[in-house]
Amino acid sequence: MRVNGTGIRIGVAVLALGLSVFAMSTALEAQKAAGIARVGWLEVCGPGPKRPHFDIFRARLAELGYVEGKNLIIEQRFADCRYDRISGLAAELAQAPVDVIFTMGTRAARSTAQTVKTTPLVVYSCDPFLHVKNLARPGGNLTGVTCMTTEMMPKRLELLREAIPTVSRVMFVHDAEAAPNAFKLTQDVAPRLGMTMQAAHLTGTEDFLSELKTISKERPEALLVYPDVVLSTHPRPQQLADFAIEAKLPTVHAFRFYVDAGGLMSYGATTSEIYMTAAEQVAKILRGVRPSELPIQQATRFELVINNKTAKALGIKIPTSLLERANEVIE
């Protein structure tokens, strides 16, 4: 009898693959039997040197009874700031499988929702109406939390007018795919404030510094920045702040970390509340609540932060009345 070596090798490989799949399936069943929850964390960029948002999310889950390393496994995936990788990573988490997937950012939320149709999703989106029609009853397999950034853009423009009454030409800095509604809202209110709006689409890629330089050619008098995930990732907030100070451009943002980096002013939700609320949504799903029954939660805590050191560097005197209303003034 003649034995074919190639056939034996293929047979062994198939057997090994089968045993591997069986072992993985057995391990998953054992985890379920032991009451171990599996949560998918899908991040556009990261992980950075510091992960305050992940730490807040994990700590809140622990307070709610889900402790990593004890009865919780967090499967993490990172897209290296490439949106074209989100769908594949979302599918990978769904097939792992996990009990629920959490992702952040409007574009990432949209890609994940388009890919994953059965695994429960909790999303952090600045514009939730791109995903659902009704915040109270989102339906389907998706719920989440919104920082209400889109709705707050006109308010930020009003604060800019109050801080610098003479400003008229404002550049709306954004990722076009993440902020279709925000720019229109801002355009609608600008004439009432005596302002004209232009838009600059920034991708936050390796050519970010070159993209910033193109802004100067349009000669804006101020920048209104929409917080895309990539634009919010280290070191881009610092690069944006350095560019704006050098170009003598005041900037208005949605989140305080831009102002900590040197931006002029921010008004928006506190990110700690956002990630704590997201963790609470995840915990409810782990306990058996269907995402369609969980209203998308809106931020309730907002803060105004002004960097007076930056204002002085720009030659701007912020009105005392505005400084007194700020939650924090950086000197």
Located regions from the model:
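Short hydrophobic alpha-helices and adjacent helix-cap/hinge residues
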Residues: 1-331
